């Protein structure tokens, strides 16, 4: 899967889960399970419930995603 195939959407973090996973509600109302990308993890960016984030979704599994950006 190339970088061009991903779907980027905005969402809001609902709750933190174990192992750096989060339940995120997307703008269209869907809820997905998302993990934190490596760059966010390396830079120690904290993600809390209520934060607005950008999530990358794979076209193969739209129920899981990767958090790639946290809005200020």
UniProtKB/Swiss-Prot annotation:
The keyword Lyase does not apply. GO terms for molecular function: ribosome binding; rRNA binding; translation initiation factor activity. InterPro entries: NA-bd_OB-fold (IPR012340), RNA-binding_domain_S1_IF1 (IPR006196), S1_domain (IPR003029), TIF_IF1 (IPR004368). Residues 1-72 form the S1-like domain. It is found in: Cytoplasm. SMART domains: S1. Disulfide bonds: none annotated. Pfam families: eIF-1a (PF01176). Transmembrane segments: none annotated. It comes from the Bacteria. The keyword Cytoplasm applies. One of the essential components for the initiation of protein synthesis. Stabilizes the binding of IF-2 and IF-3 on the 30S subunit to which N-formylmethionyl-tRNA(fMet) subsequently binds. Helps modulate mRNA selection, yielding the 30S pre-initiation complex (PIC). Upon addition of the 50S ribosomal subunit IF-1, IF-2 and IF-3 are released leaving the mature 70S translation initiation complex. Belongs to the IF-1 family. This is Translation initiation factor IF-1. The gene is infA.
